[in-house]
UniProtKB/Swiss-Prot annotation:
One cellular component term from this protein's GO annotations in UniProt: endoplasmic reticulum membrane
Organism taxonomic ancestry: Eukaryota, Fungi, Dikarya, Ascomycota, Pezizomycotina
Superkingdom to which the source organism belongs: Eukaryota
Protein name listed in UniProt: Protein transport protein SEC31
Family affiliation: Belongs to the WD repeat SEC31 family.
UniProtKB keywords: Cytoplasmic vesicle, Endoplasmic reticulum, ER-Golgi transport, Membrane, Protein transport, Repeat, Transport, WD repeat
Keyword Transcription on entry: no
Subcellular location: Cytoplasmic vesicle, COPII-coated vesicle membrane; Endoplasmic reticulum membrane
Presence of keyword Protein transport: yes
Length: 1269
């Protein structure tokens, strides 16, 4: 890593979001005091000037503006049309949210300050712009206040949560990187809350071990994973959570010695994370594996903020309370010889003024190149018809790696550019008809002619009428009606027949006119009757006469009484349909419909026009679509064009097209889909036709290359689809979906077409078609980003050009390790205060959460540590591990006192042999060596060792005052070596009822030379050591200790056996004196585990709530600065020598199933009946189960699928068990639920090893089936 620039400020900061030259904005940090005790508060902008060789290490601000309150946090939003440099938002100490225009700040305009909003009642601790919707801003502050702002309406935010729900302060807020309406907050209460803006409620809460949360970061690639940092000095860890299993963290990152204050997850490479905290360190991690790559140079005060550059992840910045913001890079280089000499040139005169200004040296090299660097060879098509190719060149062994870049020009087809421009101009002019006619003239197939002809008809004012005419079924050409006849004779009518629909409308109120032509009185019978008052005729009649039938009299009486419904019913039963229609006209529409239905039902099987008329009358054209002969599809289409309602017309056309497509009539089906505006249906046919036409054209046109033919064919398809969308005014209803798109094949063509036109320099046209693709569609994001980068104006980069001409610099060599040395590996956390007993022969259960290989720093060949039995040490009980307690490694100590002053520089002298160095090799990420002499700066002198007043104690600077219950800031506890051959895995000892007190030290190798570390677990006393001072004080019982009297149940989170044996030789005598003793033994803890002499079986261990197990061989502890004590008595013990452990066998990969989940094609014959019965019954239950039980039904289905997967793979379930399950299934089918339940209990009790998660599903199915009718 290289320190590129330094900003001399104690301030909150943020990176500029654009891709141009990097700029940093800073605001005076709240809660900090400058070296000159200035109370001035400023917002400043800093240009890094990375391309300026004359720029020194320290920068000067390029813009500055005063503020009336200090900052807790700053965010810089992306640029937009109104704000080309983006918006800067400040979280102020006085509770205000201030916004500034970055462009105006840079130009020095007086109106750079945009707004101030004061909704918070206390300080705003954190804020962040939504990465997916930049206009949305979230702020979090004291008293649990969380507000969501729209920067376009900044004065009207809304609040998430209520004042009563969260009384603790919120310290951080972070938006999800994949889902725009999800964000998370963390605060002093120890909880992480995940919020959903759609519901404006909290959707999930994570328990951060009841420790405060200082920072949150979402996984850049996985929307369900996030990191939380803990600022507590007793638990300085980073948790990785998966929201799909929120009960416990997925991984714990441990490496900081004091609280973690900030984390930053690289958006371009999810394998890179930086964190910083109260231990003055900035560590680089791989959060996916928990591996610690290394750390940046250690500074002299707390580092409270660290952030990757959002667009150039090579750069990162770290802010600390020593008054600097350091800009650094991941690339490595050789240390400057002149700078190293300057560090040793201090004299006593300026020691106190310069000792705390120089960071401690540290370096590391990434084990693999970052994701954006992993490009050994590649090619990229540039816009404007260029292709850039880079590749490595062969070099002699031992020579630096070199690459060459070549740029060449290409052109797919010169006609494509002109054709695209001509088509876009016609679309803009709205001249769709000329486009259709042009394509009709040049059509090469019947399918293409039909498609363009239909689209031409759709352009007309009355498209349905045009479609009917295109089918050759226009109303003017309909056949004339036959001669009408009566009983008295035939009379010809020469009236012209009107179109079908017009005729239907005209006679809608007189549908029965043809039924009365058989009357003997002629057409003018009723017309001759007078309707005026007092009219009298010469035709008297009897209402009820002797000649009438009983039916006629009944109808007459019903009509006289106005009971038309009864009269109609009598006429229908007597098959007098004409009379029924006449009476129904007096009774209303319902009676008319009743008579129509009765008549059409009675004439079933009669001529087809009656059935067609019935479908039209009843608005049931689906009968025509599905049941009419498919050979008459044109007539069916004409009927739909005439009578279908607008809202039903597209679906009816689609159904008719599906019938045609099933018969193989692709062209006719395409016609129906086009008329119905079903783009998702017709586009598949067009793409198939495109591929066929492309193959034929490739065979015919031998001169053209295949891609040129493909490009022209794709151009024709895009034009066809574009015209169709304009004609039908098509709106893509699936543009907001995230999966299962019906137009996925069209989206692929859009992306491909955009690439082609962009290669010809037509970027705006490419952007137009990419906007038609959903935002979350795979492949569209890359194309959009490339267009965005191409259209973004970026400044010149002379530094990059000069870097290409610079000679290769000397590189750091690969470090040579001494013989037998193995690099240390990051270890998970240990169960605190657990002491290892002698190895046991019994093998504990396998632990899937076991730690990796043990540390090579553990001393070999020594006996396990056995504490001396004194009157103050209780017996060693056996306990069980917690549900997800810390695994072996560096544990936590008791609560440590936090002091405001930073700790003094640590002694980083390693006790082990440092690796050798050479100067002639290089690393992958070296940068050219800067030969220019660095500017003079202050440096840290070497501190003379302080003689120790105690025998056998290493000299060094005394640590700051600490709690008497804490050990010194010493080394991390090393894991043990693996067990010797022939021995069973060791078992972890039980934790002490009362944890060991500080002041009992041994010797252990310190942390590697990057920086001195701190451990939170007190060291144990050396064997045989005695104390001539007071006894240690009694400790208050912990309410969190585990208290089972019998061995607790097996726990799959127990630590790996390989980490449970601690070996080491006796350490030297001498230690920090213990605190004053109490006069009685420690009080009994009613919640603590009862002391037991035998270990728990099966690797079941109890967690200790405080620190790591005491280790033999730890260094003696230094006394507090003010202690006036003499050395304790005791003999010396030989120091253990670190020796490398034997290599560990690689763990076997997990066994893969024979067939994938969900496959049911390999179920044996003996189990097929079982699967069929259970599946059938499960479907029955699922169909009838209440909606409130849907989760239970879904879980039962999932568990039954586990059983089916086992049967399909012929694993786990034995043949005799399959027979029992067959009997159980038959009992369920016979509804013998009592027998089925007895069989289930028998299988579960006798075949436990075969019963996985599926047995619960069987049990639930029996209960649900019994309760479902």
């Amino acid at each position: 890593m290289v320190r590129l620039r330094e900003i001399p400020r104690t301030a909150a900061f943020a990176w500029s979001p654009d891709t141009s030259a990097p700029i940093v904005v800073t605001g005076t940090r709240a809660g900090a005091v400058d070296a000159d005790f200035s109370d001035e508060t400023k917002l400043e902008l800093w240009d890094l000037k990375l391309d300026d060789e004359g720029q020194g290490l320290e920068l000067q601000p390029i813009a500055s503006i005063s503020a009336d309150s200090r900052f807790f946090d700053i965010a810089w939003g992306p640029p937009n049309e109104d704000h080309p440099r983006g918006i800067i938002a400040g979280a102020l100490e006085n509770g205000s949210l201030d916004l500034w225009d970055a462009e105006k700040l840079l130009s020095g305009a007086s109106d750079a300050h945009m707004s101030r909003t004061t909704k918070h009642t206390g300080a705003i601790k954190s804020l962040q712009f939504n990465p997916l919707k930049p206009q949305i801003l979230a702020t979090a502050g004291t008293k649990g206040e969380l507000f969501i702002y729209d920067v376009n309406d900044i004065s009207n935010p809304f609040r998430l949560g209520t004042a009563a729900a969260r009384s603790d302060d919120l310290e951080c807020v972070a938006w999800n990187r994949k889902v725009p309406h999800i964000l998370a907050t963390g605060g002093s209460g120890g909880f992480v809350t995940v919020w959903d803006l759609k519901t404006r409620k909290a959707s999930l809460t994570l328990n951060n071990s009841r420790k405060a949360v200082s920072a949150i970061a979402w996984d850049p690639n996985n929307s369900t994973k996030l990191l939380t940092a803990t600022p507590d000095d007793t638990m300085p860890v980073i948790f990785l959570w998966d929201l799909r299993n929120s009960n416990a963290p997925e991984r714990t990152l441990q490496g900081h010695e004091q609280g973690v204050l900030s984390v930053s997850w690289c958006q371009q490479d999810s394998d890179l994370l930086i964190s910083c905290g109260k231990d003055n360190r900035t560590i680089v991690w791989n959060p996916q594996t928990g591996e610690r790559y290394g750390e940046f140079p250690e500074v002299t005060n707390w580092t409270f903020s660290a952030r990757f550059n959002p667009t150039n992840p090579n750069l990162s910045a770290t802010a600390s309370f020593d008054g600097k913001i350091t800009i650094q890079t991941l690339q490595n280089t050789n240390p400057s010889a002149t700078q190293a000499a300057a560090q040793n040139s201090l004299d006593g005169e300026d020691f106190f003024t310069k000792a705390q200004t120089q960071p401690q040296g540290a370096s590391f090299t990434l084990t693999k190149a970052p994701l954006w660097y992993q490009r050994p060879v590649g090619a990229s098509f540039g816009f404007g018809g260029k292709v850039v190719v880079f590749k490595q060149t062969q070099t002699a062994p031992g020579q630096p790696r070199a690459s060459e870049i070549s740029i060449s020009h290409f052109s797919v087809d010169s006609e494509i550019g002109s054709a695209t421009e001509k088509f876009e101009e016609s679309i803009k002019a709205g001249d769709l008809k000329s486009i259709c006619q042009s394509h009709l003239e040049n059509a090469k197939s019947e399918d293409e002619t039909t498609a363009w002809k239909v689209m031409e008809t759709l352009v007309a004012e009355n498209p349905r009428k045009q479609v009917v005419e295109y089918l050759g079924l226009s109303a003017e050409e309909a056949p004339a009606s036959p001669e009408s006849t009566t009983e008295e004779g035939a009379e010809k009518e020469d009236a012209e027949v009107e179109p079908v629909k017009e005729s239907f409308k005209k006679h809608k109120k007189n549908r029965l006119s043809t039924f009365f032509t058989e009357g003997g009185d002629g057409d003018d019978f009723l017309a001759g009757l007078a309707a005026t008052k007092g009219a009298k005729t010469d035709s008297p009649f009897h209402l009820l006469r002797e000649g009438n039938t009983g039916l006629e009299d009944s109808v007459t009486r019903a009509i006289m009484l106005g009971n038309f419904a009864k009269a109609v019913e009598i006429c229908i039963k007597a098959d007098r349909i004409a009379d029924a229609f006449l009476i129904a006209n007096c009774g209303g529409k319902e009676l008319v419909d009743q008579v129509q239905t009765a008549y059409i039902s009675a004439k079933k099987g009669s001529p087809s026009y009656l059935r067609l008329l019935g479908s039209v009358i009843n608005d049931n054209l689906w009968d025509v679509v599905y049941n009419a002969d498919i050979a008459d599809w044109k007539e069916t289409m004409a009927t739909l064009c005439t009578f279908a309602k607008p809202e039903e017309f597209p679906d009816l056309c689609e159904a008719l097209g599906d019938r045609l497509f099933e018969t193989g009539s692709r062209q006719d089906a395409s016609f129906c889909f086009l008329v119905g505006s079903k783009l998702e249906k017709v586009v598949g046919i067009w793409i198939d036709a495109l591929e066929e036409a492309e193959k034929n054209e490739i065979q015919e046109a031998e001169a053209d290359n295949t891609f040129s033919v493909h490009a022209r064919s794709l151009q024709q398809l895009i034009e066809k689809v574009t015209v169709f969308r304009h004609v039908t005014k098509f709106q893509d209803a699936e543009a907001s979906k995230t999966s299962d798109w019906k137009l996925a094949s069209l989206y692929d063509k859009y992306i491909e077409y955009a690439d082609i036109v962009a290669a010809h320099g037509q970027l705006s046209i490419a952007q137009k078609y990419l906007e038609l693709v959903p935002a979350s569609y795979s492949g569209a994001e890359v194309a959009r980003k490339r267009l965005q980068l191409a259209t973004t104006k970026s400044g010149a980069q002379p530094a990059a050009a000069r870097a290409q001409q610079a000679p290769a610099a000397a590189r750091l060599p690969t470090r040579q390790q001494p013989v037998g040395y193995q690099p240390p590996q990051q270890q998970p956390m240990s169960t605190p205060y657990g002491m290892p007993p002698a190895p046991q022969a019994q093998t504990p259960a396998a632990n899937p959460y076991g730690p990796p290989a043990p540390s090579p720093y553990a001393p070999a060949g020594a006996t396990p540590y056995q504490p001396q039995q004194t009157s103050y040490a209780p017996p060693q009980p056996a306990g069980g591990a917690g549900a997800y307690g810390p695994t072996p490694g560096v544990g936590y100590g008791q609560p440590q006192q936090n002091f405001g002053a930073p700790p003094p520089p640590r002694n980083a002298t390693p006790s082990a042999l440092p690796p050798s160095r050479t100067v002639d090799a290089g690393s992958w990420n070296d940068v050219p060596m800067v030969t220019k002499a660095p500017p003079p700066r202050r440096s840290t002198p070497s501190v003379a060792p302080v003689p120790s007043p105690f025998a056998n104690q290493q000299a060094g600077m005394a640590p700051p005052p600490q709690s008497p219950y804490l050990g010194q800031r010493g080394t991390a506890t090393p894991p043990p070596p693996p067990p010797k051959a022939g021995q069973g895995p060791p078992r972890m000892a039980s934790p002490l009822t009362s944890p060991p007190q500080a002041g009992y030290g041994g010797a252990a190798p310190p942390r590697p030379a990057s920086a001195a570390s701190s451990t939170y677990a007190p060291p144990p006393p050396a064997p045989g050591q005695s104390f001539g001072m007071n006894a240690p004080p009694a400790r208050t019982a912990s309410p969190y200790s585990v208290a089972p009297a019998a061995p607790p149940p097996s726990n799959r989170y127990a630590p790996s056996p390989a980490m449970q044996q601690q070996q080491g030789g006796p350490g030297p005598a001498g230690s920090m004196p213990p605190p004053p003793a109490m006069s009685r033994p420690p009080p009994t803890n009613p919640y603590a585990a009862a002391p037991q002499q035998s270990p728990a079986p099966g690797g079941q261990y109890a967690p200790s709530p405080y620190g790591a197990p005491p280790q033999a061989g730890q260094p003696p502890m230094a006394p507090p600065p003010s202690s006036q004590v003499g050395p304790p008595p005791g003999g010396r013990g030989p120091l253990s020598t670190p020796t490398p452990p034997p290599p560990r066998a690689a763990a076997a990969p997990p066994a893969k199933t024979k067939y994938p989940p969900g496959d049911r094609s390999h179920i044996p014959a003996s189990a097929q009946q079982l699967v069929e019965i259970l599946s059938r019954d499960m479907e029955r239950v699922a169909a009838k189960a209440p909606a409130s039980f849907a989760p239970h039904v879904k879980d039962t289905q999932k568990r039954l699928n586990y059983l089916f997967d086992h049967l399909n793979n012929e694993e786990l379930v034995k043949p005799d068990t399959i027979g029992q399950l067959n009997t159980l299934a038959q009992a369920i089918e016979a509804k013998d639920y009592a027998g089925a339940q007895q069989l289930q209990i028998k299988i579960q009790t006798e075949k436990t090893e075969e019963c996985g998660q599926w047995i619960v599903g069987v049990k639930r199915l029996i209960s649900m089936s019994k309760a479902t009718p």
